[in-house]
């Protein structure tokens, strides 16, 4: 799937194994996993049931609230201000590449959906890059439970 403005991002299915840190160590996401009894094995086995769906800048996807999406620009600015230097630097490198090349192919951010709730599992920088350039990004929406 493609999102376009004057620049272009092509979204592809992400490699879930590259995102295990988000499950094992991200402190803000642990409560969601515990509340829904989500295991890493469930995520691994459910990833292929996911699909690319558009995600306009919003706190909801398909009417379902998305935890940790920080979808407003003000939320993004606050998040980035608190982020470590390496986090901001990686965003800047991605932004520079988009401006220089005019097009990027990126793994889609991952959203886990479970029991009427959703969680932005990974890919916030990629999501923000698209949103900040007026694009509608695509995410890999994974139904669990």
What are these regions (language model features)?
Residues 1-48:
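N-terminal extension/subdomain marker
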Residues 2, 6, 46, 50, ...:
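Short alpha-helix boundary/capping and kink motifs at helix termini
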Residues 15-20, 24, 104-145:
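A short, basic-hydrophobic beta/loop patch
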Residues 31, 40, 98-100, 125-127:
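Short, flexible coil/linker segments at or flanking structured domains
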């Amino acid at each position: 799937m493609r999102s376009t403005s004057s620049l272009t991002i092509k979204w592809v299915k992400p490699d879930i194994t590259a995102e295990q840190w988000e499950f094992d160590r991200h402190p803000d996401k642990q409560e969601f996993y515990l509340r829904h009894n989500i295991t890493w094995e469930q995520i691994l086995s459910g990833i292929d049931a996911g699909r690319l769906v558009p995600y306009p800048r919003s706190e909801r996807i398909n009417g379902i609230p998305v935890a940790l999406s920080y979808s407003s620009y003000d939320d993004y600015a606050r998040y980035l201000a608190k982020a470590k230097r390496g986090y901001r630097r990686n965003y800047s490198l991605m932004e520079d590449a988009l401006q220089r090349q005019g097009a990027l192919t990126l793994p889609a951010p991952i959203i886990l959906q479970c029991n009427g709730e959703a969680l932005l599992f990974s890919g916030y920088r990629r999501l923000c890059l698209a949103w900040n350039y007026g694009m509608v990004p695509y995410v890999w929406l994974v139904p669990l439970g």
